[in-house]
Amino acid sequence: SDGLFSFSVNVNRATANSSDQLLRTGRRTVSTSVRDNAEISVVGELPPQTAKRISDSIKFRAAQ
């Protein structure tokens, strides 16, 4: 939660079936994006545009 919205972020390795998706049911949004061989899902009671901004803001570091 950021104090305004309640949401969860999940990051998994992308598969061949992974694709960008957006689902809005009532106040709940499920936004999935695929980037850098990762599938990023944001789930919560927030606007779709906010879910997209959250997933776009995630940065990956190289493994050490």
Predicted regions and their residues:
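N-terminal "mature-domain start" segment
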Residues: S1, I58-Q64
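Short, solvent-exposed recognition patches
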Residues: S1-A38, V43, P48-R53
